[in-house]
Amino acid sequence: MGETAQIQAKFFTKDERYSVPDTPFSIAGSTTPEQLSSLINALLKESSASPDQDEQPAFDFLINGELLRLTLEEHLETKEIPQETIVHLEYLEKCPPPSPVDSLIHDDWVSAVHASEAGILSGCYDNTLHIWDTATGTRRLTIPGHLGPIKSVKWVAVAEPPCTFVSTSHDETAMLWQWDRRTNAVESVQVCRGHARSVDCVDVSWNGAKFVTGSFDHMLKVWSADPDSTDTDHGQDGSEEGSRKKQKTVDGKAKTRVPVLTLAGHHEAVTGVQWTDEGEVATCSMDHTLRIWDVELGGMKSQLAGSKAFLGISYSRLNRQIVSASSDRHVRLWDPRTKDGTIVKCSYTSHAGWVSAVHWAPNSDHQFISGSYDTLMKLWDARSPKAPLYDMSGHEDKVLAVDWSLGKYMISGGADNQLKIFEHK
């Protein structure tokens, strides 16, 4: 295509505040997204549809559902779209850049994080858990208890006191805790035993009744999340833990809890787990597979094959899709409902090291974050596979964990002993 190519384009938007006339415009092929944004603002000014404000909004543009990151001409050539056709450009307000809010210092690697209205829960390689005040960044509590590095943490219930959360560790256990926000007292109420190696990941069911753990022992285990449950847990898999007697209390300390269900099938460490429905769980593993499990029937439903070891996954309830972190620098988008078992919907390439963690936005079906050994956390739009929206720098060593459970805050934990908080506007 020549530099002087003229392209016929129509603009449309779902945001009525910024609508412009639905007429074709002749636009130079060399026009950039920034120049298109200026054009929309000029049209808005002409039609007086623009809000009464000095600052002009910046816009992003979509062609056939993909964000425009090149000139119009380059994009059409890349996508093999004939330049003679009328190009329909959807535009939307541009996502503002995240701003750094705080850096919370730990004494060792920060390997786990989960934020809620109750506060930020973090796990450390010095075997300790921490609860932080989200608004002020002050440490509420440092909690010893595990005998090995913390691998994952998750709030279970925060609506009513006391708050409940679960932690997993290299010490082969998961622990269920209760924390009183008013008195700042914390208690370990259940020690969950059954795994034979490091317990590397955890997720809580949507109704808060159960949680599921994945381990370096290749196993997936489902547990009751009720702190007061004293029922005998009969394993549906016929394993020995299911036949044990009721939970025991030793010297008044935390009771020992056994799993409700054990699921075997992975051939290597289970590195990520997510509830995808009340009775369904997705896992990823170092064995290069994603698997979907039916925890009601106690078996595997489907398997998606990857090409590299998976290090983490995140499931979006809004779009019902999974993003995965891998040991080959790429983030991948999967549809767990696919039947052929191999379809990767999209790959996102920008990191320069292993991608250690991913997390969907809680209130957007397009945005997610990733953390990598290259020290960066990145904000992505699923419609822009070639480049992230923004890089969030600040870590001085590899990023080990990320969290975007609160819409306002994107959080990363790193091997530089820091927990970084960025605000999403």
From Swiss-Prot:
UniProt record, GO biological process: maturation of 5.8S rRNA from tricistronic rRNA transcript (SSU-rRNA, 5.8S rRNA, LSU-rRNA); maturation of LSU-rRNA from tricistronic rRNA transcript (SSU-rRNA, 5.8S rRNA, LSU-rRNA)
WD-type repeats, residues: 105-142, 145-187, 194-233, 265-303, 305-344, 350-390, 394-425
One Gene Ontology MF term: ribonucleoprotein complex binding
InterPro entries linked: G-protein_beta_WD-40_rep (IPR020472), NLE (IPR012972), WD40/YVTN_repeat-like_dom_sf (IPR015943), WD40_repeat_CS (IPR019775), WD40_repeat_dom_sf (IPR036322), WD40_rpt (IPR001680), WDR12/Ytm1 (IPR028599)
Family: Belongs to the WD repeat WDR12/YTM1 family.
Record has Metal-binding as a keyword: no
Protein keywords: Nucleus, Repeat, Ribosome biogenesis, rRNA processing, WD repeat
Protein name: Ribosome biogenesis protein WDR12 homolog
Compartment(s) of residence: Nucleus, Nucleolus; Nucleus, Nucleoplasm
Bias (Basic and acidic residues) ranges: 231-253
Ranges for region Disordered: 227-253
Database matches in HAMAP family: WDR12
Function: Required for maturation of ribosomal RNAs and formation of the large ribosomal subunit.
Gene Ontology annotations for the cellular component aspect, listed alphabetically: nucleolus; nucleoplasm; preribosome, large subunit precursor
Region Ubiquitin-like (UBL) domain: start-end pairs: 7-93
PANTHER family xrefs: RIBOSOME BIOGENESIS PROTEIN WDR12 (PTHR19855:SF11), WD40 REPEAT PROTEIN 12, 37 (PTHR19855)
Gene source species: Ixodes scapularis (Black-legged tick)
Annotated Pfam families: NLE, WD40
Principal subcellular localisation of the protein: nucleus
